[in-house]
Every structure is written in C-alpha cells, then in structure tokens.
Amino acid sequence: MGWGAPLLSRMLHGPGQAGETSPVPERQSGSENPASEDRRPLEKQCSHHLYTMGQNCQRGQAVDVEPKIRPPLTEEKIDKYLYAMRLSDEILIDILTRFKKEMKNGLSRDYNPTASVKMLPTFVRSIPDGSEKGDFIALDLGGSSFRILRVQVNHEKSQNVSMESEVYDTPENIVHGSGSQLFDHVAECLGDFMEKRKIKDKKLPVGFTFSFPCRQSKIDEAVLITWTKRFKASGVEGADVVKLLNKAIKKRGDYDANIVAVVNDTVGTMMTCGYDDQQCEVGLIIGTGTNACYMEELRHIDLVEGDEGRMCINTEWGAFGDDGSLEDIRTEFDRELDRGSLNPGKQLFEKMVSGMYMGELVRLILVKMAKESLLFEGRITPELLTRGKFTTSDVAAIETDKEGVQNAKEILTRLGVEPSHDDCVSVQHVCTIVSFRSANLVAATLGAILNRLRDNKGTPRLRTTVGVDGSLYKMHPQYSRRFHKTLRRLVPDSDVRFLLSESGSGKGAAMVTAVAYRLAEQHRQIEETLSHFRLSKQALMEVKKKLRSEMEMGLRKETNSRATVKMLPSYVRSIPDGTEHGDFLALDLGGTNFRVLLVKIRSGKKRTVEMHNKIYSIPLEIMQGTGDELFDHIVSCISDFLDYMGIKGPRMPLGFTFSFPCKQTSLDCGILITWTKGFKATDCVGHDVATLLRDAVKRREEFDLDVVAVVNDTVGTMMTCAYEEPSCEIGLIVGTGSNACYMEEMKNVEMVEGNQGQMCINMEWGAFGDNGCLDDIRTDFDKVVDEYSLNSGKQRFEKMISGMYLGEIVRNILIDFTKKGFLFRGQISEPLKTRGIFETKFLSQIESDRLALLQVRAILQQLGLNSTCDDSILVKTVCGVVSKRAAQLCGAGMAAVVEKIRENRGLDHLNVTVGVDGTLYKLHPHFSRIMHQTVKELSPKCTVSFLLSEDGSGKGAALITAVGVRLRGDPTNA
C-alpha cells in the first residue's frame, strides 16, 4: 500500500499555504510490517525541502516549508524506505511507557537478572556542592580516542577548575586485542602524560571514566558486563577494570596511581555539569554511543543496601529492546545493521539512535534504493558497498541548512555514484528521517526518566537540569532542536534546562573523584566525632561494673555520704498483695505538668482500679520562684480538683509522687536533696516536702489531707506494674529524666535499721558519674550541654540518657558539623542556635523507619532548618547515634541492677520483671529494643521482662498509700 496520490502530488508540486492540512496516511503503533499497515490522515507532512531551517519531520507537527520539485519516486518505494522510520507521538508515548517499565524492572531485585535495561548503581551519592578542591588525574576511555586530563579544583575564592589534557590514539589492534594489551597501552599513555608534567612522584588521585556497562559494588571497582561500540578486547568481560589497570601500572613500576573512582561517561557528564548547576540530576550522552544516568531514590534500588538518600543510576539504555520489546518499530535496515555488527542482538536501542550506527543505517538504505534503481540511476560502487564509508559526520554535513545539498554531492561523488541534484535531495531526505527518528526515540526514553524523577519527588511539575554531551548532539545541525521540541511535547509538565558539557566526561571523572575525596574526608571527620558515642561491649561492661560499685557505696553507712548514687530507702517494704481497698488521692509532680488523681481501689474476687485525674501546668516563674509559691499553686490545683470531683470535705489519704531526689526517714517524709529537670524553687532543698505540702494546705484553710506516703515516680511505676505482675521488682523511668528503683534485701540497706525482709531502693542513678567516674565516655558535647544546664556538674548520667538532654546533644553536634561545612551549606541559622529546639518527639519522629527523607526534611523545616537530602541523612544518623548510646547506657545500668538482685539471692538464674514508664522509652522507635538487647548481652544469667506502665506513677502512689494504710491498720480504709 502506498502513500497515496495526495501526498505524491504534494511532493511533486510542494504544499499549499502554511497551516493547511493534507490527508496523509499515518503509520500505526504495534504493527510489524510497515507496508501492510492501516493508514490514517496526518496533519502535516514534511516536504522534500528538508534542509530548510526549522523543518520538523514528524507527525502531528505543523511545518512551514518552501515548495521544491521532487523526483517522481513511486509511492510504493517512498513508503518502504522512508516512512517505516516515522514515529507518531502516540507511538513515542508508548515507547516512553515501555521504557519506564524497563527501568522499574532493572531496579527490582526479582526482575533485574532478566531485565535488558540494567539500571546499574554507580555508588555516586552526591553531586558537587562547590566545596571540592584538589589536584586530580582523569582518564577517559570509551570513545574513538582516549583522553588523559589533569584537573585542579580550587574553591577558595570562586569555584575554579583548571584543566590540561592530552588525547591518545586507541588503535584497532589494541581495542580488538587482549585485555592486557589494552590496559598496558592505557598505563603507558598515563606514564607519558605524567612524565611530561613531571608529576610521576605525586601519586595523585585518579578518576577513571570507563564508558561501558559495568557492575559496581563500590565506587572504586567496576566489573565489565559487556563491551559495546567498537571495543572487543579479550579477557576483560567479567573482570574488574580497576584491578586490570592497577596490574598494568604495577608492571611498569615507574609511577604509582590511586584510582579513587570509576565512572561511566554519562555519570561524568552529569557531574561535570553538576559542578556548574546543582540542579543537574540527569546525565545524557548522544554521541558514538548513547546512554543516560540520573539520581534515583536509594529506597527504590533493591540491589543496594539502605534506603536513605540518592544514588546515581547508570541506565545503560543502549540495551533497551534487547529482549524484543522494540521489535514492532525496528526496520529491515536496523536488523541488517545488527547482523553485521560486532555484537549481534545487543545494544539494539543504541543501534537505532547513536552516532556509531547512524551513517551505516543511511548507507544500507541508499544501497537498497540504488539496487532498486531509485537512486544514482542504479549505480552501485564498491565504496557504497563498504561498511563504514558513509559516516554520521556525513549525515550531519548533508543536513546543514545551506550547504547540505552541495555537501551531499561531494560525499556521494567521493563514493563514486555520480549523483544528480535530485539524488542529493533524496539522500538528504533519508538522512533527515534517520536522524529525526533518533532524536524522537531519545526524547521518549529521557521523558521516562523525567517522569520518574517527578514521581519520586511527588511534585506536579518538575524543574531539573540535564547535563548533555556527545558528538551527535553537539555537531549535528538540527538534532538538539528537534530533540528538545519532541521532549517538550512528550513531557509538558517538566521544565528542563539542557547544559552542554564543555569539557567532556573526563572533568566529570575528576569531579566524581573530588566529590568522593570530599565525602571521604567528611565521612572520616563525621565518623571520628560520632565514634565517641559508639560504645563497645567492653565499655558497656565497664559502665555496669562502675554502677555496681557506686550502688554498694550508696548502700553502706560509712560511704553513703560521699556516694553519688544515693541509693535512697523509700520505706516501701511490700508490693501490693491484692487486699488493698478504698478511695485515695494521688498527686504526681515531676515535670512542667502535674496530675491530681482520685483512685478507687476495690479488692475481692474481681480486683479493680478506677481512676479520675486532671492535669495542671506549672508556669516557669513558679518552677523557679519560692517554695511557698510552688506549694500554694499545687494546693490551689488540688482544691480545684476536689471541687471538680465533688469530694471536698472528708480528710482523705494522699500519696505524693515527688519525682526528685529525696532522703526519706519514713514513708510519709521526704527531704529534698536537690532539684532536677529545670526546677529551682527556693527554700525547698533540705526540707520535708510532705510538711511543705501540709503547711500549704493549712494556709489555704479549705480542706485537710492525710499525707500517707511520699513516693518517687520510679517507685510508683514499679508498684503500678507490680499490682498487675507480682514478679515486678524493678522500676525504670526513661522520659524527661531517668531513674531506677528495685527491691533490695534489708540486710544490705545499712541506712535503715533491721535485717528482715526487703525495701524498695530509689537509686537516683541520674547522678551516676557526678564524681567523674564516667569522664572516659563523656564527650565534648556532653560537657557543653552540662555547662549550659541549670544544674551544671550534676545528674551527668541522666544528661547522657534522658529525653530532656538528648535533643540538646544532637543540636550541639549539628552546630559543630555546620561550622565544618558538612550541614546546611555551612550556614548556622537562628533556630539552630536556639536551646531546646530538638524535643524528644522530634528525635523519635526523625528516627522512625517509616519516614522517607522528604518527611524528615519536612520535620526539619518545621524547626526552621532548610535541609538537603544529604543533610537529612546526616541529621538522622546523628539522632540515631545519640539515642543508641542512651539506650545502651540505660541497658548497662539495668544489667547492674538485675545482676545485684540475682547475686543477693544466690541464684544461678533470675527471672524478673521491670516496670517501665517515660516518653523516650514509649515513643522512640528503637530505644526499647536496643536497651533490651543490651541488658540481655550484659547479664546473660538473667531473663528480664519489661512491662509498660499504662497508668503512670500516680496510680502507684495511690497503691503505696493503700499498702501504707493497710500496714498501719487504719480502720477507715481497712
């Protein structure tokens, strides 16, 4: 079936007015045989005047052209030779969709082995940020020549890159010989280059651009998958090219080289352009070969461990179609070219679009047309029949605006075919169809990458830069314009800037090396800083041992006065036994908020605890005012609660959870040793808090209270859990502050008379280390946080593990890293200077496994910190290191406690339960798991269960009050 009379007439006489529509048939997608396809009207077809600037040989595109006389070729032949390569936007969008699917398959662990588009991870994780500096060598091997460059990068005053380079030949006998010959040649050229510049003794870092498909597991290793283009050196496929090059250099023995990074030329192009434009996240080569790379989210790359950040993916899109997915658009000429190539059946997409094959495709078409007497009056010369005689540079010359037809005549004459003017115009038409198809296909595949980037970012419109290189894109007079135009139509929701790589991919290899060097140096400094937070098992065992020693000091009468871990007797001698009964008030004071509770405890067959509570806040001026103001405020809130519950009247028993270090001389007397957690109220330290509360009640003269028990929140937590689980003999709080308590044998509690039974000891372990025994593991950041705290020099262990201080440690590390230029572009913002900005909840959110980096960035943005993807990763790392140390230290402390209980009882193995409360333990995604693991590792002879206190320490205070009432035999609530 031919093109039809309307088109033939138009070709003979030229089009009518610009903008007219001619009913021209259209090739449909998915059909195997162009000659047997259905035809549909087409809006505007290109005329024969194809060298006119601004022509657009493409379906669905209006074209304004001048009339020109066309040789009367038959409609059948024109259809067969030219029209089969014409692709509509509909087909191009279909190809875009196919390539998007191929990309997904290549990234998937399950589908990658059979995927034709390999989507190779490059281990390039960052584009240049402008702070790179140094002196580098770059090798660029992969095209028609081999380049060596010396690249000096200086960023002190302005981003400045100076380069000197030399080009070396890669003769056919070398690229088709053995691998050792090839790399000996590279090593020889490198030696020559260094000799001329007198830098043989320098051992400069080397970046190696190796423009072939390689599998990498790190940045300085590249295992060749397959040769492409004209290379076929034996013994290299399946081998690490870095090792081969190092071996060749070593064999020479006259210089040494440090190969830091191997990159694909496409990655090199992206990095070269990325130095000038940090929006550049795609690299594109359209030259001898073709390929593209782009920055992919690590969470989508199954073949690489980790899910944080991005990594450059080398698509190796030249192999698109090797699985048969492009058979419907490949022509007989594509198949013939493939059969005669060095690698039949491979790189099929590349063979349809790249400069290495374009001239050959045109030659095959011309041969067939000549054989059919459609060109050159049927003359076929030996030159025309010789592969490689018609090059892509010939195609470019023939398609130039003004001299195209004349160039065609000269080129065809060189081939001995004696062309007529009409032959030259026809050949120009063939060249245009072939090169236009190439531009369209590359636009479709690049469109798929842009769509993927847009989807990854979750933005309706993408703004990005594509770094581009390659002789076809640069030298062909019409290629880039056609390519851009098609791309705009295929992906209208992307704003793309094309940045031409002026200095090739060699500079890119140097930039990758510079970035790798910068990142390695940054990584070294970051690791050095964070290593002080990473505690070995041996260090944790030492912490456990030291705490055990401090516990013994606190329990003994003779050493208690100088002990930092005070081991305070709580006078709680029994856990609940289930017979407790009555209505009790509880007061829970331990932070900026406090609770008043009514707790109704019922015993019998069905034990129940019913609670009513109200939360009140304590303003900062009262926290740091006088003691009378603080306790008057508390009593005012109790009065409000009694009115609220309608129970003001009878004298009710009250348990007072007071979460600060107190020395108790009885259950209902607690003398405040020191304020913690930001409290500073005067005239309280050294006084009995129960008496201070009773005095405030008297001053109010509204109601009376029976203060039965003063309880630490940790003891309250233990009692709450012990009511549910009788094996609970330890209490732990890890929230704003941190503390632990446990049931100690009375014989070991020298501060209280009597040797029978047990008593709960409030350890007050927050002060562990106040005597300097933990200085070997305290970091400079711990010291800064301590120095600026309200109670400098005190509660040092607590300041390393509790929620009130972890955020401050993180903030100080971030300030240090920002000063060093590792974070936030080196800019210390006002929010970062603000103490207390990093609350525990932010640490918990940032470390959540479920959060993608975009969400981490959003959290940082809420805090006024504008972060890049890399910033977010580092912030998350810092949070993780600080919270892990906290969990491990907490675990080491708990291991000391459970071991003491086991030894007290002379058991080979102890089963015990810990009642736990506190926001850090409850809300942090990893804290509890790490702490449990640490306890298990450090106390293997103990099986420790952890029970979360659901009702807080207020319920515990009521239970202790109930136990106290029961033990004193009070008839009102017996």
Curated annotation (Swiss-Prot):
GO terms for biological process: canonical glycolysis; carbohydrate phosphorylation; establishment of protein localization to mitochondrion; fructose 6-phosphate metabolic process; GDP-mannose biosynthetic process from mannose; glucose 6-phosphate metabolic process; glycolytic process; inflammatory response. Pfam families: Hexokinase_1, Hexokinase_2. ATP 1 binds at R86, D140, L141, G142, G143, S144, S145, R481, R482. ATP 2 binds at residues 588-593, 736, 803-804, 840-844, 919-923. GO terms for cellular component: cilium; cytosol; membrane raft; mitochondrial outer membrane; mitochondrion; sperm principal piece. CDD domains: ASKHA_NBD_HK1_meta_rpt2 (cd24127). It is found in: Mitochondrion outer membrane; Cytoplasm, Cytosol. Changing E75Q: Disrupts targeting to membrane. It comes from the Eukaryota. It is a peripheral membrane protein. Pathway: Carbohydrate metabolism; hexose metabolism; Carbohydrate degradation; glycolysis; D-glyceraldehyde 3-phosphate and glycerone phosphate from D-glucose: step 1/4. It catalyses: a D-hexose + ATP = a D-hexose 6-phosphate + ADP + H(+); D-fructose + ATP = D-fructose 6-phosphate + ADP + H(+); D-glucose + ATP = D-glucose 6-phosphate + ADP + H(+); D-mannose + ATP = D-mannose 6-phosphate + ADP + H(+). D-glucose 6-phosphate 1 binds at D140, L141, G142, G143, S144, S145, F146, R147, D265, T288, D469, G470, S471, S505. One of its GO terms (molecular function) is ATP binding. Residues 264-503 are annotated as: Hexokinase large subdomain 1. The modification Phosphoserine is found at S393. Catalyzes the phosphorylation of various hexoses, such as D-glucose, D-glucosamine, D-fructose, D-mannose and 2-deoxy-D-glucose, to hexose 6-phosphate (D-glucose 6-phosphate, D-glucosamine 6-phosphate, D-fructose 6-phosphate, D-mannose 6-phosphate and 2-deoxy-D-glucose 6-phosphate, respectively). Does not phosphorylate N-acetyl-D-glucosamine. Mediates the initial step of glycolysis by catalyzing phosphorylation of D-glucose to D-glucose 6-phosphate. Involved in innate immunity and inflammation by acting as a pattern recognition receptor for bacterial peptidoglycan. Belongs to the hexokinase family. Monomer. Interacts with RABL2/RABL2A; binds preferentially to GTP-bound RABL2. Interacts with VDAC1. The HK1-VDAC1 complex interacts with ATF2. Interacts (via N-terminal spermatogenic cell-specific region) with PFKM isoform 2 and isoform 3 (via C-terminus). Interacts with SMAD5. This is Hexokinase-1. It comes from Mus musculus.
